[in-house]
A protein has these predicted regions:
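Alpha-helical assembly-interface signal, strongest on the long, hydrophobic N-terminal helix that forms
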Residues: 2-97, 114
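Amphipathic, coiled-coil-like alpha-helical scaffolding segments used for oligomerization/assembly
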Residues: 102-106
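Intrinsically disordered, low-complexity regions enriched in Pro/Ser/Thr/Gly and acidic residues
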Residues: 96, 107-198, 202-205, 213-220, ...
C-alpha cells in the first residue's frame, strides 16, 4: 500500500516537473487572456468609425437641405420669385436619396425645416415649418408661429444653440434645418449604447424672394406639415 502511495507521489512530482518546464502551451494561454481585450478594442473601433461616418452624413444632409431651400424659387411674371410646396418636397426627397438605403434617414430620422424671419413688430418668428421622417423628434426651438417675446430674454430668441444662435434681419429669412437620427450600431447597443444624432444648419435666403408664404400652384403638392410622422411624398 505504502509502495503505491510512494509511486503516486513520484509520478505526481515528475508530472509537475514536466509541466513546469513545458512552454508549448504558454502561447495559447496568453492568447486566451488577450483575445477578449483585442475583440473589445476591435468592436469599439468599428462602432466609433461607423458612428463618425453616420454623424458626417447627417451633418451633410442638414447643410444640403438648408442650402437648397435657401436657393429654391420659381420666377413669376411681374412679381417676386416664389417658394412652392413642391420645392420643399424636392429638397426633402433629395435628402432621402443623399442618405441612401444604408442610412434610411426618413425611416430612422426626421428633418425639420423652418423659415426664421422678423415679423411686422421686428421680432424673430418661425414663419413656416415643414417636416419629414418617422422619428418623433420635433424642433428644439418651437413650432410654426413661435415668436420672440416683446420684452425680456426668456422664451424664443432665435434659432441655434448657445452662442451659435442666429437671428434674421429685416426683409430677409434664414432657412434653418434640424436633422435627428437614431444611429443603429453595427454590433448592437452593448458597445456604445443607444445614440441619437442631431445636427443643424442655417443659410440666408439667396436673392429676392416672396417671404410672405409658401405657394402651392396647380398641380398642387402635398404639404409636408409637421403633424405627420411619415416618409412618403
Amino acid at each position: 500500500m505504502s509502495g503505491n502511495i510512494t509511486t503516486a507521489i513520484k509520478e505526481t512530482r515528475a508530472f509537475l516537473g514536466r509541466l513546469k518546464g513545458d512552454e508549448e502551451g504558454m502561447a495559447f494561454i496568453e492568447f486566451g487572456f488577450a483575445l477578449p481585450i483585442f475583440m473589445a478594442l476591435g468592436f469599439t473601433g468599428v462602432e466609433v468609425a461607423g458612428l463618425a461616418i453616420a454623424n458626417m452624413r447627417v451633418n451633410q444632409i442638414a447643410m444640403t437641405v438648408a442650402d437648397n431651400l435657401s436657393r429654391a424659387k420659381q420666377s413669376v411674371p411681374l412679381g417676386l420669385p416664389q417658394l412652392r410646396e413642391v420645392d420643399i418636397n424636392d429638397a426633402l426627397l433629395g435628402a432621402r436619396i443623399q442618405g441612401g438605403g444604408s442610412l434610411e434617414i426618413l425611416e430612422k430620422g426626421r428633418i425639420v425645416v423652418s423659415s426664421l424671419q422678423r415679423n411686422a413688430s421686428g421680432l424673430q418668428t418661425i414663419t413656416w415649418q415643414r417636416c419629414k421622417g418617422k422619428l418623433n423628434a420635433p424642433s428644439s426651438y418651437g413650432a410654426q408661429g413661435a415668436t420672440q417675446p416683446s420684452s425680456g430674454t426668456s422664451g424664443f430668441q432665435g434659432m441655434g444653440a448657445g452662442s451659435n444662435r442666429v437671428q434674421a434681419e429685416a426683409n430677409s429669412a434664414i432657412i434653418f434645418a434640424e436633422v435627428s437620427y437614431d444611429y443603429k450600431p453595427v454590433f448592437g447597443d452593448w458597445v456604445l449604447g443607444k445614440i441619437r444624432l442631431r445636427r443643424e444648419a442655417a443659410f440666408y435666403v439667396r436673392d429676392d424672394r416672396d417671404l410672405t408664404q409658401i405657394y402651392n400652384p396647380s398641380p398642387t403638392a402635398s404639404a409636408s406639415t409637421c403633424n405627420k410622422l411619415d416618409s412618403t411624398f
